[in-house]
Amino acid sequence: KTLLRWITSGANFGDPNSAKVAKVEVLPAQRMMGAHGQQQLSVIAHFTDGTIEDVTTTAVYEANVPEMASVTKHGLVKTMNEPGDVGVMIRYQSQVAVFRATIPLGAPVDHLPPQRNLVDAFVFKKLKLLGLPPSEVCDDSTFVRRVTIDLASRLPTATEAETFLADTNPNKRDQWIDQLLASNDYADTFASKWSALLRNKRDDEQMELSRPGTYAFHGWIRQAIQENRPYDEFVTGILTASGEASENPATLWYRSVKEINSQVEDVAQLFLGQRIQCAKCHHHPFEKWSTADYVQFTAFFSQLGRKKGEQISEERIFHRSGLATAAHPKSAEKLLPSGLGGLQLSIQPDQDPRQFLAEWMTARDNPFFARALVNRYWKHFFGRGLVDPEDDMRETNPPTNPELLSALTEHFVQSGYDMKNLVRTICESTTYQLSAKPNQYNMDDRQNYSRYYPRRMMAESLCDSIDVLTGSVTRFQGMPVNTRAVQLPDSSFQSYFLTVFGRPKGESACDCERGSDSNLAQGLHLINSDELRNKIAAGDGRAVQLANDKDRAMTAKIRELYLTAFSRPPTEQEEAFVVEYIDLKSKANPAAAQQALEDILWSLLNTKEFLFNH
């Protein structure tokens, strides 16, 4: 109808000097609502000439969690029965606003677990507001396995698990976290994560020629993680990298991300949590970024130069002298560099604009930089960000716990962008150490962290964990024997297992490349693949070694298997069942003990308790 009225009135494009919409206001902006409640929103547009207009019936609405609330085209919000926060995005012309509804459960929260740090302070505050009692703290077996997988991408050894369980030191959990943070496994784990996000990958058409640079960049990333290089320095080293890979491996990022638009979009998404791809052509529909913002950000990379390096496969990255500008695609106006939401900068022709970009990004008052990293790391440990997706931190996609995100961001900045300190703070919290077992109230909770959310091990961790349990070794072409999957420099190594379990391809700055869902191909591979059968029956594997060990009791061998797989000893029922099964197999044929142990290994690695971090 609006379009028809415009056409019948002469399709006038209007006066370019007329008042524009300066902001949109939604009333109410926030409300505590019960399950199956309703709230009619009112939307007011404020114009640059000071006038206002009710635009409730012409604004556009969208709920960010449709499972929690719906909204009609005229702004009537209807909540479901899932507790938590839901945002409704409102857009009118180029402006946006957000209505937030909090849906409490209303159960009594009388007894909270011990509060250990700022994470717990804000999580428990939210749980009290919602009336959502948390689960109990997990036991030692669950904790040592959980945190070792998250920090080291591996299972604790049977000896490590048994030692940890026997330790009576009340600070043993914190000490184990520190031990993992100091390990090579921690550096391997997060180097693998960052290498994929930075798109460090060999060129498919020049696999061998591009190998040295790819390996060098992975090594540079790993060293930064191992040394705990401050995050602001880590990012600055990548953005301002100049020279050749042989002298400065960080320049390889510019080989992987060649196009200027890709550089702009990757930096915004990866380091600032802002998806500005839409703004390249038009105003982002649910964000404030315009095409001008996109172009001004592009200008930071406008003077990036490339020339042939000394090595055949290498380029030399350098700053081309000249005024940094970028042309608006519609007006052709030359725009100066500007950070998102910042002022345009006049940079001298002999100055590298990338340095100014890095300084703007890493400034302590930057509203995006530290916040994006905190949210990304929160997702690593909890399976979802405080803002989800973790790299879509627009105003219209609000965090589920704004106070926690702000406090943790401030803590990270005050620590000097210390990534290990951030990881330690998260892992030492009671919130991280809650049990995955739901109580009668929090089964449906998916966003408030009233319990730990189980998730399948990532592909590399699962591959390495199966090797540990079976005592086998996965061989990767061109790599030393005993190289773990998580230590691979890039995703170019052929492995059906890693592919089917969701290893990222390294073709995007989005962690969404990593597959975490279960599927039929995974199940069939675990149950009946030659690869798994060969690992279980490996000539120097665990089943053979245990079968040939005549000095240990069968109960001790079973204990080793359970400690390795689950970081806990078997229950009496489990032990009795396994002993009986092996005895039955061995009575018919004494040599069948090995086959029986192989059967037990197969059954253990196909359990959810093994496949999931919980």
Regions inferred by a protein language model and the residue ranges of each:
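Globin-like tetrapyrrole-binding proteins
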Residues: 600
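Amphipathic alpha-helical scaffolding segments comprising HEAT/armadillo-like alpha-solenoid repeats
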Residues: 191-192
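Catalytic cores of secreted or luminal carbohydrate-active enzymes
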Residues: 2-13, 521-528, 532, 536-537
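Metal- or metallocofactor-binding catalytic centers and their adjacent structured scaffolds
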Residues: 188
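Long, His/Glu/Asp-enriched segments that create or flank divalent metal/ion-associated functional microenvironments
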Residues: 470-479, 486-487, 497-503, 508-527
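Primarily short, surface-exposed interaction patches in extracytoplasmic proteins
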Residues: 113-185, 196-477, 512-513, 533-597, ...
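Extracytoplasmic soluble-region selector
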Residues: 1-124, 129
